[in-house]
Regions:
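Coiled-coil termination/hinge junctions
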Residues: 1-37
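Conserved, carboxylate-rich catalytic/transport cores that coordinate ions
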Residues: 26, 35-363
Length: 363
């Protein structure tokens, strides 16, 4: 402990510059703690130590250390953002975005009232039996929020352990039966994908403005417009509407693409194709959810075919437990994949340096 304390002291004093009459210490600290340090220095040294804040210059942006700090609702979702390298100071903390969209995608995929109730009970158990801030407590909180979305989408889909609600409780979908309405579910998934990706591209343009790179911001906004035009053209192609004419849209794309190619080279059309591929990836929301409802229906059918109510409950219970296990694992993995690969690639700049304040080592 003594050796660690001495090493910490030497690391801190290595940044100090001293003369016979004065000393200078330079370092980083959180902006909201500057006033407290100023008051502490005045109290301890009666104004003989001067604290000066310096503006962060553009050339120093990559050197600024990063500390993730999120309020109550978003804090548990740091278990996902910490799986990634830290974002750079000029980028964004991805935690709030994960906190907003991960439970939504999770609920869209699982979407079952019965499964949501079980997950809510499990989340309550984890949150109650583990100290706040620990891994399992945070998992419980994330699971609880995701379970609420699962309940909401379960009501919209009319699912209670698959089709058990329809058979026993006369439960019907508020929105649509995703086990039968495959095309509407595909359209819904792609719509969510378009909104998610466009948000990411908008954040990417704003990030370039924060770095004082207006040219790059304009290029990203132009690509955003190209994606919107392409999506509208595809909608008009597959679902012709009187108000949506594909001709002017294709002309606009034809005018915009040469401008992007002049600015970005041949990477511009490839980036457009890549972005469309990112959007298509959201079809997995429909595919995984469809598999989940089919497995739930199979569990109910096999349970009903046994001829014995106790054996049927046992068989159906085992199969539903297996489906629930898959129903937690698959939505988690694929929701995170949609964030890490499709969404964050549009704006998140990773590789930040962790903020490590000077302090005595903990015993």
């Amino acid at each position: 402990a003594w050796l660690e304390e001495r090493l910490a002291l030497y690391r801190a004093t290595a940044t100090a510059y001293t003369t016979r009459l004065c000393f200078i210490i330079q370092g980083w600290m959180a902006n909201d703690e500057v006033n407290r340090l100023h008051d502490d220095l005045n109290s301890a040294f009666a104004g003989r130590v001067v604290l000066e804040q310096q503006m962060i210059l553009d050339e120093d942006l990559d050197q600024v250390p990063v500390m993730l700090r999120n309020p109550g609702y978003f804090a548990p979702f740091e278990i996902f953002s910490r799986l990634l390298p830290l974002p750079k100071y000029s980028s964004y903390d991805p935690t709030p975005l994960i906190g907003l969209f991960f439970p939504l995608l999770f609920g869209m995929i699982l979407g079952d009232i019965g499964y949501g109730m079980i997950l809510l009970l499990l989340a309550f158990f984890l949150a109650r039996h583990f100290p706040p801030g620990t891994l399992f407590s945070n998992i419980g909180k994330v699971l609880g929020i995701s379970a609420l979305y699962t309940l909401v989408f379960g009501v919209l889909y009319g699912e209670f352990f698959g089709d058990l609600g329809e058979t026993w409780l006369n439960l019907h979908p508020v929105w649509f039966d995703r086990g039968k309405a495959v095309v509407p579910m595909i359209v819904f998934s792609l719509t969510v994908g378009v909104a998610h990706i466009l948000l990411g591209m908008t954040l990417g343009a704003l990030a370039e403005l924060r770095r004082h790179q207006p040219r790059k911001a304009l290029i990203k906004l132009a690509m955003l417009v190209a994606v919107i035009l392409t999506v509208l053209a595809l909608v008009g192609w597959f679902y012709p509407q009187s108000w949506l004419s594909t001709g002017p849209l294709l002309i606009a794309i034809g005018i915009l693409m040469p401008i992007l190619i002049a600015a970005e080279g041949l990477l511009a059309p490839l980036e457009l194709l890549k972005t469309m591929g990112n959007i298509i990836s959201y079809v997995r929301i429909m595919a995984i959810g469809f598999c989940s409802i089919l497995l739930a229906v199979v569990a109910n059918r096999l349970g009903g075919m046994t001829g014995d109510i106790m054996v049927g409950i046992l068989v159906a219970g085992i199969l539903h437990a297996f489906n629930l296990l898959l129903g937690v694992f698959a939505p988690t993995v694929h929701s995170l994949r949609l964030h890490y690969v499709e969404f964050f690639s549009k704006f998140l700049d990773l590789g930040g340096r962790r903020f490590e304040p000077w302090q005595k080592p903990h015993p």
